[in-house]
Amino acid sequence: MLETRFRIRTPQRSLAFAVTTVTAAAATAFTLALAASTACAAAPVAYVTSEKAGVGVIDLDQMTLTKTFPVGADGPRGLSLNADGTRLLVASKNTGDLAVIDTASGQVVQRVKIGKNPEYVRVRNGYAYVTYEPGEEGGPPAANNAPNGKPGADDDDANKPPAEIAIVDMKTWRVIRSVTSGHETEGIEFSRDGHTMLVTNEGDDTVSVYHARTGAPVRTVKLAAGGRPRGIRLSPDGKDYIVTLESLSKFVVIDAHTFQVVKTVDTKLGPYGVAFGPDGKRLFVAAARDKTVQVFDGHSYEHLADVPVGQRCWHFSFTPDGAKLLVACGRSDAVYVLDAQNYQPIRQIGELPLAWGIVTYPHSDGSIESH
């Protein structure tokens, strides 16, 4: 009788154990699914560096400024996100470092010493590339982008030390090497395979080409004298680089294989930020001195449209869904929001004094980040 009862109860215990195990597994799966759902449901955001206020956080569903990370005293300028959006890397002009911000809390969790006047940041393949200028004084640009506000004044000095590019390992948060560049390095772009890095050098009218991982120089591309190259972006097919020439009010198309200039296109005054639209069919250029974003055909580079915006609009980003264009306008202390298809204004988001750069999460294309 005992043997019979034993045989009957064992399956029940096994069944109970199995049910408990399945229930626990189901609960775990449900919790993970709920967490994933919650993460997916979180509103997309834009991060905007304001040289006076800090880093503004914009809810892209509501198109409102929801908070500001209080790093304004650091003089934040260039910025870029890590792959999962948990860390925002900001070039801090006044402190000479790279501030690593936890995007959940808004707190600086790491500081990486860079050097004098860090400006531009790009993240690629687990490394952060940060430009800095040992020979420059920094500070917001004078009116008309000239010293003391005098149009046409020349602030270049060939005797100043050239710019440097610090390469930061994002696992250890250490500078693993620093690469000597040209004068007043402005923009950073990478080849399609990520093996080659190109930077624009405003002060000596060149584009420097390097091996991205080692920093070894490959070549220097000389552009038109006095052009002041600033923005740079790779075409979606990987065949060309677009470089804006601020002082000549043009952009050039550089063959990605030969590094020869194959086309020159006129723009309005003072072009800086440049990016292709998410579908690659249009090219957008921020003509900062003309208070205009210009639109060109992404293949022929034929001029398509001029879109009025605010003052000193250097950088911009599309929203993650590609529906809107967000333009950071520093002298208007605001982000201008435009419909990315018909270019109609939607709204202005203020309280961003000396807005400098803008990126989004989920990641989207723009004049700073390209995905």
Model-based region annotation:
Residues 1-18:
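N-terminal secretory signal peptides that target proteins for export/translocation
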Residues 40-371:
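Predominantly soluble domains enriched in secretory-pathway, periplasmic, or organellar proteins
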Residues 16-37:
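Bacterial N-terminal signal peptides
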